[in-house]
Amino acid sequence: VPGRYPQATIRLLTVSELQALSMQELRIMRNEIYARHGYIFKKKELMSHFSDQPWYKPCNTNVDHLLTDIEKKNIELIKQFER
């Protein structure tokens, strides 16, 4: 699995590992899940960040139907820590 945070796609994340991350790291981790499915970001900074990744292939404006149950649960958990 490509990216800086492959664990967000492979397994359920834990509270303790998310507590150790900064807001920016949490944001990148959450959006990396979408990027792996080729999501085309509307925010310039996210598009710029992921466009620098050799594995990123933007091709979808909606990837919700591509997300696994693990990814969906991790996105919701990460959002709780981004507040």
For each feature predicted by the language model, list its residue ranges.
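N-terminal low-complexity, Pro/Thr/Ser-rich intrinsically disordered segments
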Residues: 1-13
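Amphipathic alpha-helical packing elements
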Residues: 17-58
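Conserved catalytic/binding loops enriched for acidic/polar residues
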Residues: 10, 15-16, 70-74
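Compact alpha-helical subdomains of small soluble proteins
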Residues: 41-83
